[in-house]
A protein has these predicted regions:
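Single conserved hydrophobic/aromatic residue that forms the stacking wall/gate
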Residues: 1-11, 209-216
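Non-transmembrane, aqueous-exposed alpha-helical and coiled segments at domain scale
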Residues: 24-208, 212
């Protein structure tokens, strides 16, 4: 019952009793510093007794090292917990989804005999585009001695676009093709203004962008 779950969750010292009485435990791991607190290692440890692992934000600029029976791994985009067959790993809508990097990281696991993990990606996750990485690099060069020391992974330009509402969500790849083309053209126009007048770099060429039929 709901009352049983509330009572047993208050009793933190008796998790087994909570589970026997039908209680569901949700654990949130949040870093309160500037990173490197050990979030990934803690998540990997808790994943052993969890059914679902959710990464809710961040991108491939982050990193955590996991050592297990398969070897030593440095994960950057995949959620901790991908090494457990019983878990489902979810990439949430706050994640900077670098699709080529995600595929590369999955392959790096299976190449070392790790079973293919069960992965779900939110259709509202926003896609990190190649020009985000380029803009990150250009901005660091422009700032020169006053640069922020970016990892040049495109994270700052990505989140700037996200909150300016000019990014691309996963669901848009499966929506109306004409609307997607029009949005791409509008975004390219905005980006080219910055490329030409602020960074003095080659412009984005819309004619080179090809939209393929997505695999469902």
């Amino acid at each position: 019952s709901r009352r049983q779950r509330q009572m047993c969750i208050r009793d933190r010292a008796d998790i087994d009793k909570c589970q026997r009485n039908g209680g569901n435990m949700v654990k949130a791991i949040v870093g309160a510093n500037w990173g490197d607190e050990g979030k990934g290692k803690i998540t990997d440890m808790l994943a052993e007794e969890s059914d679902i692992i959710v990464r809710f934000q961040g991108g491939s600029n982050a990193g955590h090292t996991i050592i297990n029976e398969y070897g030593k791994f440095a994960l950057h985009l995949l959620p901790s917990g991908v090494f457990y067959n019983h878990t489902t790993s979810i990439i949430g809508n706050g994640v900077a989804l670098n699709i080529p990097y995600l595929i590369k990281e999955l392959k790096s696991l299976t190449d070392r005999n790790v079973p293919m993990p069960k992965i779900l990606v939110s259709d509202r996750a926003q896609i990190l585009m190649p020009y985000h990485v380029a803009f990150d690099t250009y901005e660091e060069a422009r700032l020169a001695g006053k640069s922020f020391g970016s990892t040049k992974s495109g994270i700052a330009p990505f989140y700037s676009d996200k909150y300016a509402k000019i990014g691309f969500q996963v669901n848009e790849l499966f929506g109306d093709e004409q609307e997607l083309k029009e949005k791409i053209a509008n975004v390219c126009t905005l980006k080219n203004v910055m490329l030409e007048h602020l960074y003095h770099q080659p412009l984005l060429n819309l004619s080179l962008i090809h939209i393929s039929e997505p695999t469902r």
